[in-house]
Amino acid sequence: MIATSLPSPGVIAAAVIGALAIVAALALLIRRRPDAFPLLAVLALPFRLPISTGGRTVNLLIPLYLLIAAGILTRLASRGDSGAADRRRQGRSGERANVSPPWLARLLTPRGLEWLLLGAVVLYGVQALYSADHTKAAENLAFFYIPFGLLFALLRDVQWTRALVLRCLAVAVALAVIFAGIGFIEYYRKSLFLNPKVVAANEYDNYFRVNSLFFDPSIYGRFLALVMIALTTVVLWTRSRRELLIGAGVLAWLMAGMITSFSESSIAALLLGLAVLAAYRWDLLTTVYISGALLAIAAVILLASPASLHFGLKGSGGSANNATSGRTNLVSGGLELFAKRPLEGYGSGSFETEYKRHSDTTAENATSASHTIPVTIAAEQGIPGLAVYLALLLVGFFVLFSGAGRSPPRIALAACFAALVLHTWTYADFLEDPLTWTLLGIGVALARE
């Protein structure tokens, strides 16, 4: 990983002045062209810069932070014109689901989702007070939860049109195509541009994993999977033969890029997203039958495959734990932490510290163990955090899926969110990923249209 330590005060001052100038320029652009904000947000989503301080390296989305600051500045400067935005925000916030009791009907609304997101951030902050790793908790709040919450609010108030949605998708697809191309270069050269940890791991594996300009192959695969799901929506619902052929070609390119990442979690997320699209496009029952048949075939192949294919079920040390890259044992260790302190947990951001302390394991294993989000939340935040997380998933799925049947953009968002949630169950980052807040922000806006 290319890490930079904090520079001299003079350099910091110059950087601050430059950042302020960039924010001012972006704010002026957004003020004149409101549609520029969502387009630039999609453009900035993947780009992280590694900053080293206090003995650890944090990969920060500096371009996205600058854009969010510009968006907030524009919002503050145009408060006198905020009536339309307020009306859009309130448009369907009072519309309730046809369920009982009344409190549940109020919860299953876009406004209910907003309150749950706010509650998740507040609870995380409160539970950071007794965490064994205050620094990690503070970093997550300052660099992820709070700025991404602002991103959610800004995207929620955008006037989304079909043309704007397609332009944002075009930006995401262009990025994915470029990233996949860079990944092909890495695979051909057997050399990565970023992250020496992956380089070191590749020296011991029987295959070479690429991560393009991301700092992790699985996060790279996650991005490709979500873009592919969104693009597949266009392919399935288009009436243009030209769009169909171009989309199919791009999907083949991106699929090849995902394969070079060797991210099983990303492939699983992609398959779930495609299953959701198929259920909407054709028939739910048929989709279930086909999906079940494919899963059965995959299971037979997995069980019958020779050890030389390295699936981990056969050969020396073959087991379910080995097949899941050691995830089974790591998850069980996280559940043991939850069992020891189920009510309040060990505090926000403390999972790796507490896992090392109780399991007497390496920092690398502790980091891997934290890559199953429900287990991490249970261990860190106990029953309260787990309850908020489950409620957030329930309401999020309800808001995104409810009424999405006639709107391809909403179907795409729902499928992408389902895929993202599955990916976080086998890898890291849920509310720490701006993609989560982006999908929910756009989804809430479209649900109120």
Identify what each model region corresponds to.
Residues L76-R79, G181-K190, M258-T260, A278-T324, ...:
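A membrane-periplasm/extracellular boundary helix in multi-pass inner-membrane enzymes
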Residues M1-I2, L49-S52, A200-L213, N329, ...:
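Juxtamembrane membrane-water interface segments that cap and precede transmembrane helices
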Residues M1-S78, V126-Y130, L420-L422, T436-T438:
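N-terminal signal-anchor transmembrane segment
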Residues A27-A36, L73-W115, V234-G249, R281-I290, ...:
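Membrane-interface helix-loop-helix junctions at transmembrane boundaries of multi-pass membrane enzymes
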Residues F193, S308-H310, G317-S332, E336, ...:
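Long extracytoplasmic/lumenal interhelical loops at the membrane interface
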Residues P63-Y65, G112-A120, H134-D157, A176:
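Aromatic-anchored transmembrane helix interface
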Residues L64-L73, L274-A275, T286, I290-G292, ...:
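Transmembrane alpha-helices of multi-pass inner-membrane enzymes
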